Design a protein with these regions (language model features):
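ATP-dependent carboxylate/acyl-activation modules
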Residues: 2-42, 132-134
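Residues within well-formed alpha-helices
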Residues: 30, 55, 125-126
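Cofactor-cradling patches in redox/metallo enzymes
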Residues: 35-112, 116-122
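Two-component system phosphotransfer/interaction surface
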Residues: 119-132
Length: 134
């Protein structure tokens, strides 16, 4: 994989799954691409919304990436949990199966959406932009 290093300092990214759909390939590929691009990646695995917020706070992450597996309502709960622990300014992106109408709602909330087919290079580039803006 040829993903250039977008980071001058190692930004920290939490990658987590939000559903029990059993598909790990995309999560693993995104985590690897971000590592290859110079990010420190915390692979959280399958976590509840409160756990995602706790890990993000405890690890002082710069960015949160979520595999939503079609369950968009869980992203709303995660955003609420992030606000509750004072991380409402931490950028969030999600991927996986996201219905078009839900993608627009997520974007309105400030969540970046990367549907299936988005290149790993595009995700790494966006992660670099999102962490540089902080």
């Amino acid at each position: 994989m040829n993903v250039s290093n977008h980071q001058s300092t190692r930004a920290k990214v939490l990658i987590a799954k939000t559903s029990l759909d059993g598909h790990w390939r995309g999560v693993s590929l995104v985590a690897r691409a971000l590592r290859d691009a110079g990010f420190e990646v915390i692979l959280g695995g399958m976590l509840r919304p409160s756990q995602i917020a706790q890990v993000a706070r405890d690890e002082d992450v710069d960015l949160i990436g979520l595999n939503v597996g079609g369950r968009i309502e869980v992203v709303y709960r995660i955003m609420d949990e992030l606000r509750a622990v004072g991380l409402d300014d931490t950028p969030v992106f999600c991927g996986g199966t996201v219905p078009p109408g839900a993608a627009a709602k997520l974007r309105d909330m400030g969540v970046e959406v990367y549907p299936p087919g988005t290149t790993l290079a595009a995700i790494a580039e966006a992660a670099g932009r999102l962490t540089a803006e902080r």
